[in-house]
From Swiss-Prot:
Free-text comment on the cofactor: Binds 1 zinc ion per subunit.
Protein's recorded name: Snake venom metalloproteinase adamalysin-2
Species for this entry: Crotalus adamanteus (Eastern diamondback rattlesnake)
Annotated family: Belongs to the venom metalloproteinase (M12B) family. P-I subfamily.
Keyword hit for Transcription regulation: no
Length: 203
């Protein structure tokens, strides 16, 4: 951490119509949940000297403006096109994460592009609202953001002290999670190789 420079991620979270309906159209419940999730994510990223702040939350109460389907790859592709063509024209932010209540094939909980932070089309991830426990959804979103920041998967049994590693494949329910040394190394390599500019400025 000592060697990692201070960086700032301005995050947009979009909650789809399925999430809106799942919480009985209660915007306050969704807002509170997303704010708590991003707070937890920010806590995880402190060890990497990254501030993650929620700069915009969109809740789609009407028709979803992008194609959300059981194929996570197609949904991720659709979100990327939407970010590039629509979102960036309205809000110049660093990354967008889609929170959806759809059932993806193969029990997928999330998906994201690797090494893509700051890229207009591919600085995106999708996360299934798969648990009532905020911590577990936060781990999934932190994991997808990790891919955007260059992190590959850890081993399936990876631990850091008593904590489970955030970049394990799949999700093991637990009480505490941290980034592994390998994850920090991948992130350092991403910074050196891609030199992402959008995360330099304070929100």
């Amino acid at each position: 951490q000592q060697n990692l420079p201070q960086r700032y991620i301005e995050l947009v979270v979009v909650a789809d119509r399925r999430v809106f309906m799942k919480y009985n159209s209660d915007l306050n419940i969704i807002r509170t949940r997303v704010h708590e999730i991003v707070n937890i994510i920010n806590g995880f990223y402190r060890s990497l000297n990254i501030d993650v702040s929620l700069v915009n939350l969109e809740i789609w109460s009407g028709q979803d403006p992008l194609t959300i389907q059981s194929s996570s790859s197609n949904t991720l592709n659709s979100e990327g096109l939407w970010r590039e063509k629509v979102l960036l024209n309205k809000k110049k932010k660093d990354n967008a994460q889609l929170l959806t209540a759809i059932e993806f094939k193969c029990e997928t909980l999330g998906k994201a592009y690797l090494n893509s932070m700051c890229n207009p089309r591919s600085s995106v991830g999708i996360v299934k609202d798969h648990s009532p426990i905020n911590l577990l959804v936060a781990v999934t979103m932190a994991h997808e953001l990790g891919h955007n920041l260059g992190m590959e998967h850890d081993g399936k049994d990876c631990l850091r002290g008593a904590s489970l590693c955030i970049m394990r494949p799949g999700l093991t329910p637990g009480r505490s999670y941290e980034f592994s040394d390998d994850s920090m190394g991948y992130y350092q390599k991403f910074l050196n190789q891609y030199k992402p500019q959008c995360i330099l400025n304070k929100p």
